[in-house]
Amino acid sequence: MREIVHIQGGQCGNQIGAKFWEVISDEHGIDPTGTYHGDSDLQLERINVYYNEATGGRYVPRAILMDLEPGTMDSVRAGPFGQLFRPDNFVFGQTGAGNNWAKGHYTEGAELIDSVLDVVRKEAEGCDCLQGFQITHSLGGGTGSGMGTLLISKVREEYPDRIMETFSVVPSPKVSDTVVEPYNATLSVHQLVENADECMVIDNEALYDICFRTLKLTTPTYGDLNHLVSAAMSGVTCCLRFPGQLNSDLRKLAVNLIPFPRLHFFMIGFAPLTSRGSQQYRALTVPELTQQMFDAKNMMCAADPRHGRYLTASALFRGRMSTKEVDEQMLNVQNKNSSYFVEWIPNNIKSSICDIPPKGLKMAVTFVGNSTAIQEMFKRVAEQFTAMFRRKAFLHWYTGEGMDEMEFTEAESNMNDLVSEYQQYQDATAEEEGEFEEEEGEN
């Protein structure tokens, strides 16, 4: 079967990861002790995508938890599903990375990385046919960003042909948790561009907005935000885990979404999102789901898709629905909003349908879009980076760990290149390409 090994790093990654395992376990009927209490054979049919079956019919997540300080791990272990994980798969240091990318990537993290890789190997060996890795981490801190990207490059070296998918929480525009976020994020993006296959970009501010506006929560907690992310994460892999009419997997997703290798940063969304009160008053239809799915307010990262154009998009539907209706809706969206899709990639929305909806819903959809508008986010981080780097503020924390200023300059220009690549394809039209070819032919 096509297994996925899940890795979570740093505080943010571990909190999102813990929530994700609650959601997945719920979908597959696994209780906090790893015992199956489900009501349908479908839950067990492909449970080995995310779980290993241990002795006595116990299901153990293929999850690796890493951090440079023990705090978050202890709270995961004490949390509702803490006893689910294999104790050997908790790998942690004692020092912490102190929000310093260099500590995570070069010093503290580098000391711990070998023990993480041992666990990764052990998990990979327990798979029949490993599909790939998914990593949850944030880019603003030290461990998830520094050590997370170090792990990605090491795993990349060892498993070059497996898909590497990340769920990366990027710094928010207005809310900043750490002053040095722009540094950590830029250094991380520099790595992700080269070593990851698909990055789902998430940010807290967009998640807060969804909680306020759509879910009508007055005081959303990180738990609520992480639940949103988990819903989308589970949607991305539901086709691997449940039977469907039109299947998709991580590799198909990558092939359909990435027109150029560097442009693999996606926005994700999830529908239906309704406030708890109004849930039972409406029956969902495919058109309604499609409408909400493409709504800018539904995106889990603070970039407005209306400011750019979609290169490609993928709609992963869940529930019983007609394939014909899904296809019609997808065509409909592209025809009505043609200016928001590049015309040089015809039919650029891929859809897939998985028969089993999430718990408590009749149908749902996860949206993954490759939009040029994501450059807004990179631009924002780059501006903050430049403002500090020009004055060499806070640099001594990084150079003290053995980093060189050159690395910062490289990361900065790599990020600026990425922004201009997105801009170039946003402006490109179908006709121009033809003209270029003719000119070349004449010479």
Swiss-Prot record:
Keyword Nucleotide-binding recorded: yes
Q: What biological processes does GO assign it?
A: microtubule-based process
What subcellular locations does the record give? Cytoplasm, Cytoskeleton
Q: Does Transcription show up as a keyword for this record?
A: no
Q: Which Pfam families match?
A: Tubulin (PF00091), Tubulin_C (PF03953)
* Binding-site residues, GTP: Q11, E69, S138, G142, T143, G144, N204, N226
Q: Which GO terms describe its molecular function?
A: GTP binding; GTPase activity; metal ion binding; structural constituent of cytoskeleton
The UniProt entry lists the main location of this chain as cytoplasm
Q: Which SUPFAM superfamilies match?
A: Tubulin C-terminal domain-like (SSF55307), Tubulin nucleotide-binding domain-like (SSF52490)
Q: Which SMART domains match?
A: Tubulin (SM00864), Tubulin_C (SM00865)
Residue ranges with Acidic residues bias: 429-443
Q: Which residues bind Mg(2+)?
A: E69
User: Which coenzymes or cofactors are required?
Assistant: Mg(2+)
Keywords of the record: Cytoplasm, Cytoskeleton, GTP-binding, Magnesium, Metal-binding, Microtubule, Nucleotide-binding
An example GO CC term for this entry is: microtubule
What post-translational modification information does the record give? Answer: Some glutamate residues at the C-terminus are either polyglutamylated or polyglycylated. These 2 modifications occur exclusively on glutamate residues and result in either polyglutamate or polyglycine chains on the gamma-carboxyl group. Both modifications can coexist on the same protein on adjacent residues, and lowering polyglycylation levels increases polyglutamylation, and reciprocally. The precise function of such modifications is still unclear but they regulate the assembly and dynamics of axonemal microtubules.
Which portions of the sequence form the region Disordered?
A: 424-443
Q: How does it assemble?
A: Dimer of alpha and beta chains. A typical microtubule is a hollow water-filled tube with an outer diameter of 25 nm and an inner diameter of 15 nM. Alpha-beta heterodimers associate head-to-tail to form protofilaments running lengthwise along the microtubule wall with the beta-tubulin subunit facing the microtubule plus end conferring a structural polarity. Microtubules usually have 13 protofilaments but different protofilament numbers can be found in some organisms and specialized cells.
Task performed by this protein: Tubulin is the major constituent of microtubules, a cylinder consisting of laterally associated linear protofilaments composed of alpha- and beta-tubulin heterodimers. Microtubules grow by the addition of GTP-tubulin dimers to the microtubule end, where a stabilizing cap forms. Below the cap, tubulin dimers are in GDP-bound state, owing to GTPase activity of alpha-tubulin.
Protein family (similarity comment): Belongs to the tubulin family.
Comment field (misc) = The sequences of the two genes coding for beta-tubulin are identical.
| Protein's UniProt name | Tubulin beta chain
Organism in which the protein naturally occurs: Tetrahymena thermophila
According to the entry, what is the taxonomic lineage of the organism? Answer: Eukaryota, Sar, Alveolata, Ciliophora, Intramacronucleata
Its gene name is BTU1
